[in-house]
């Protein structure tokens, strides 16, 4: 099966055929760096990171850009509230975002353009829009004339009144039409600004992505992706700007949108006070469990985020890493099995891929428990294959990329491990002396410290209990 992706533009799953099979292009909308990103912001980078890896395997190369919005009124407000320079806000939270993504196993994109580094391209695109009569200057603002673009609304498929309500547009005296949106606006001395033909000012949010996508990927790109909340007005406006500036019929050939996260059944929002930041979550939970949870539902569907979901993800990874630990004697190199690739080819069906991963682990455990019924060579071959496929399936999903020992001991340091081993040895000595009361007391002491013991034919194994 070839790669098929759901195209929001056409509302259907379609075969993916890149303009240049030697190197597809993909642009994903990144964060506005005014605070720590919440877990909902991480779903896109995780999911579309899986897609990026798939495209590289399939085509041999990929040009992937994910932007940073580092000029925005939210950033200005944060700097004013905290009494620090704007650069202090953007540098701090840009670094935090990259660190959070690294912990979640998100590979960096090929290009991570920042808006402030692309002012010449942004200004040039606005000039093109004015020249082509798709934009106008009014009271030191430059605005896009929505009624100049006949295809406006083709992505969101909303009628004009619905679009006007959905955009929460500002009714301003400098607008010819309420639906027109800002490309450039004036800046006071206290706000960041750049010299332009229309005076000192700063760009609107939408034009930044259009200019950066064109600068790094060209006038027409293969895939443009982001959260469903960006479909309108942000992506709708990107299409209008880009097509009108370049005089082209297509800006992005495939539009992909990931669903939103709910928290404990309610919409995740600041007003409800139920925002969970990645920064806070990785301090409390294994980052790989957060990644697993983000992949557990199909990317286009809403995902109900909860402590129960995280706990279930931890338990699943315990089983997977436990299986790999039991396969330690069987050296193997990762091999991605066909059913994993088939699941991902089916519009990134990560839940199906995770189910296939669990099946591989179950098969391995059955083989491990049933070794007496087969010839040694046959068992070794089967377990080596299953381990290779387990590792390969994990590789395709960005999972199982650490050793079982690292997974089970995370949250501990060298002195902790020395202390734990000393107690395990003491428990072993107590059992040898048939002092089972003492042995049970040591097990209980370790449990109170968050350490779970497992007695196996190969000796005692321990793991840090994660929540």
From Swiss-Prot:
Top EC group: ligase
Positions of ATP binding: 270
Pfam families: DALR_2, tRNA-synt_1e
Record GO biological process: cysteinyl-tRNA aminoacylation
Keywords: Aminoacyl-tRNA synthetase, ATP-binding, Cytoplasm, Ligase, Metal-binding, Nucleotide-binding, Protein biosynthesis, Zinc
InterPro entries: Cys-tRNA-ligase, Cys-tRNA-synt_Ia_DALR, Cys-tRNA/MSH_ligase, Rossmann-like_a/b/a_fold, tRNA-synt_1_cat_dom, tRNAsynth_Ia_anticodon-bd
Protein name: Cysteine--tRNA ligase
Gene, per the UniProt record: cysS
Cofactor note: Binds 1 zinc ion per subunit.
A cellular-component GO term for this protein: cytosol
Taxonomic placement: Bacteria, Pseudomonadati, Pseudomonadota, Gammaproteobacteria, Lysobacterales
Entry-linked PANTHER family: CYSTEINE--TRNA LIGASE, CYTOPLASMIC, CYSTEINYL-TRNA SYNTHETASE
